[in-house]
A protein has these predicted regions:
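A broadly used, surface-exposed interaction patch
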Residues: 64-114
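Glycine/small-residue-rich interface belts in oligomeric ring/scaffold proteins
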Residues: 45-77
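A contiguous, surface-oriented mixed alpha/beta subdomain in the mid-to-C-terminal portion of proteins
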Residues: 2-13, 17-20, 25-58, 103-270
Length: 270
């Protein structure tokens, strides 16, 4: 297990308004989730807050998914006060809208970096990392090691994100410069915190639920009584396994069926 070094701000909590408008020579940039409701990218354009913006899937292997693309946005300096007021009131979008950071790197350097980091390695396979979704990235960033920072967050000097409260991160002093040619791996320590997060557990529960209906439809219909109860029961089953210290990342619908069969057999013999 890799030990994460906490990099949260140890001072009193900082509001969006304070952070966005404090004296700093590093410009503010946003990673926005265009699938959040309402679309925060549209909100930025509607309010004329955009200095520069670009969809990160454009020109990459994910270009066919352009409508789902995260956006890199540099906000106009004169609008930071207004943006801060909206974010403080949680009026921009839902809780998946994205996050903000400061950087001294050029626009092109940042754009190149983020486009290369949309794909990461998970269990030896290349997968899309939905880092623009606060529920995904926010579950992991607190566990980032200096090595994770140097690779995934190479341009970032400071980062602000809405977790249980607005949280401010500084770049760890131990960070190197990073190398975009080195693939970023979602290590065991990041997978662990992801699966222990409410959204991570819900995503896995939904995956098992869909697997059951697609591959074991008859059994899924039988188990889904009363109707709509199956997915919450799967989530509860996974949570119990986590609390017992068991690994759940490779669980499938078949595993759930087997567990239910064993449970029924035990009940029969009682």
């Amino acid at each position: 297990m890799v030990n994460a070094i906490p990099v949260e701000d140890t001072e009193s909590p900082v509001s969006w308004q304070e952070w966005l408008n404090k004296s700093n020579d590093a410009p503010v940039f946003f990673i926005l989730n265009s699938l959040a409701k309402p679309d925060p990218v549209a909100h930025f354009y509607l309010n004329n807050w955009v200095e520069e913006a670009f969809p990160l899937y454009s020109g990459t292997p994910m270009r066919k998914m352009l409508k789902q693309s995260p956006w890199l946005v540099q906000a106009k300096v004169n609008n930071l006060f207004q943006i801060g007021a909206v974010l403080n009131k949680h009026e921009l979008s839902d809780n998946s809208w994205g996050w903000a950071y400061r950087s001294h790197k050029s626009w092109q350097e940042q754009l190149t970096h983020w486009q290369r980091r949309q794909l990461v390695t998970l269990n030896g396979e290349q997968v899309i990392f939905r880092m623009m979704d606060t529920r995904v990235f926010g579950a992991m960033v607190s566990a980032f090691t200096p090595s994770d920072w140097s690779l995934m967050l190479a341009p970032v000097t400071e980062l602000m994100i809405d977790l249980s409260q607005t949280t401010h991160f500084h770049r760890p002093k131990e960070c190197g410069q990073g190398n975009d040619d080195i693939p970023f791996t979602l290590g065991e320590h990041l997978q662990l915190v992801w699966l222990h997060s409410p959204y991570g557990l819900k995503v896995l529960s939904s995956s098992l639920y869909n697997d059951l209906w697609e591959n074991h439809g008859v059994m899924a219909k039988k188990l889904d009584q009363p109707e709509g109860s199956l997915e919450p029961r799967i989530e509860q089953w996974l949570r119990q396994k986590l609390e017992a210290g068991q690994r759940i990342e490779n669980m499938s619908g078949q595993d759930y069926l087997l567990a239910m069969e064993q449970e029924n057999n035990r009940s029969t013999y009682l």
